[in-house]
Amino acid sequence: MTSLSNSLSADTGTTSFSPAAGGEVSDFFALLKPRVMVLVIFTALVGMVVSDATVNPVIAAISLLMIAVGAGASGCLNMWWDADIDALMTRTAKRPIPDGRIRPDEALAFGIVLSVGSVLILGLASNWLAAGLLAFTIVFYAVIYSMWLKRATAQNIVIGGAAGALPPVVGQAAVTGHVGIESLVLFAIIFIWTPPHFWALALVKSGEYARAGIPMMPNVAGPDSTRRQIIWYSLVLAPLALLPVWLGFGGWLYAVVGVLGGLGMLAGAVQVYRLREGEPERKAAMGLFAFSILYLFLLFSALLAEQGLGLFRAVAA
């Protein structure tokens, strides 16, 4: 890895960032990728509520906090490692390290302390299975994905997506002490959802990824191949997302959201495949990117309403 205090050159010019004397609290918080932390808390919570167990609210709250901190720690380590390429991309150039607000060594120390602390506290407050799964998630994202896969293969998002899919598994383990079929199904849904979600964005940002040297699918296999793969993943996702209904922990509300959302994903994927030039292409890709977020949110919200709030009953119960 090149020194983060050196100037970074790109084909279009030179970007540099200097070591900061110390960042503000808000800068350190930004290192944690707070938007990702919110999603992690949400999916981990759903992993907890679908479990057939009595949940201790105090342990659940501490566990959610530690899972979120662990996710933030891995995000911090990711930003530390990726600061050189972040400086080359418009959407990431203003992150705390490339913008010079936080020194790389500060970010590294911050990420390590939070990683170790979150795992230890989760183990002591809940159980060591959950702590081990959290540790694996952190290492997988910060080391295997960030330091290896991201810059090595166009399948980076596919394989690396496992890290983003693990929070429901960690959540279930935290409140039950084991990993059940419910959280594994949620893992599979997020895992298959991830490629079409990120590849839609990659179609629009392919130039920036190429400039930063990241082998995203549109730059390696080409836009047309990427569009076809988005359709294939969406075709797999639609029936996969209905598994909770057949397994008895998804009710009629979830079924309706799953069917309509799955059809929406397929329709968006077809639009991305059809519209291949200019502004219509960009709108179709960004439309699918935005809809995929809404789809996953509504899907998991339906489970939360049914299982967590007890508003509905599972159709297969």
Swiss-Prot record:
InterPro entries: Protohaem_IX_farnesylTrfase, UbiA_prenyltransferase, UbiA_prenylTrfase_CS, UbiA_sf. It catalyses: heme b + (2E,6E)-farnesyl diphosphate + H2O = Fe(II)-heme o + diphosphate. Its EC number is 2.5.1.141. It is found in: Cell inner membrane. Pathway: Porphyrin-containing compound metabolism; heme O biosynthesis; heme O from protoheme: step 1/1. One of its GO terms (cellular component) is plasma membrane. Belongs to the UbiA prenyltransferase family. Protoheme IX farnesyltransferase subfamily. This is Protoheme IX farnesyltransferase. It comes from Methylorubrum extorquens (strain CM4 / NCIMB 13688). The lineage of its organism: Bacteria, Pseudomonadati, Pseudomonadota, Alphaproteobacteria, Hyphomicrobiales.
